[in-house]
Amino acid sequence: MNRKITLIIFLIISSSCASMAQFNLGKVLDSFKKPEGSTSLSEGDIVKGLKEALTVGISNGSAEASKKDGFFKNELIKIVVPPEAQKVAETLRKLGLGKEVDKFTLSLNRAAEDAAKKSKPIFVKAITSMTITDAVGILKGEDDAATKYLQKTTNQDLYNTFFPVVDSTLNLNKATQYYGSMVKTYNEIPLVKKVNPDLKAYATQKTIDGLYLLIAQEEKKIRKDPVARVSSILKTVFGQSGK
């Protein structure tokens, strides 16, 4: 690919110049003319490249999150005790019940890892529905513009799909039992403010938030790091080199 194409794509992706506010996809495509005997980069190529970028991102993100300890040993997305129950955990540790708190925390993350296995089809559906308008918005956007597109189009479906998985895993791993015991023990302490946060809703949303964080990381890699562009169309659209 000639260096002119690379430069133009780089400018689109970086979106660092004020003039990009006047970005016109048609004009960009007109400037993609290649030497005789070669083809132009079409709107379809750009959309295809973006869809592949998102697919790579969600595949890597989902795989990372759904493996054993994908949540539990990743401090970026590890699910901890709900904020409303932090005092519960702290108090129980002081009472020598830290192991129960640890078991509960592990169960939360196991539930997230199980739920993450269900995410890819939902993300793929959103990606295949992407329009040229969506693609232009993503190209002009920030480093996490594609991730924000997925947040807008998948959050509710993910929640509806994840909730029963989280519910089932929490029950299977006795997290609900641990949690109930923790809260009950705490609430029986004289003069403390009683707590009982919605554990299942909390764990479900934190699972979704964790996935988006991982996908945002993958998106940034693809935008910034040529090595992360694993297919020819990604190399073309995201301008890996002057080839």
Predicted regions and their residues:
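Boundary of Sec targeting at the N-terminus
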Residues: M20-Q22
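A cross-kingdom marker for long, charged
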Residues: K27-F32, K200, T207-K243
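An amphipathic alpha-helical core segment
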Residues: V165-K206, L211
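Mid-length scaffold segments of soluble, non-membrane domains
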Residues: G98-T169
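Sec-dependent N-terminal signal peptides
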Residues: K4-S15
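Metal- and O2-centered redox machinery and metal/ROS homeostasis
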Residues: T39-S42, V47, K51-L54, D114, ...
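Residue-level signature of catalytic and energy-coupling elements of molecular machines
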Residues: G61, T131, P226
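N-terminal Sec/ER secretory leader and immediately downstream segment
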Residues: N24-T105
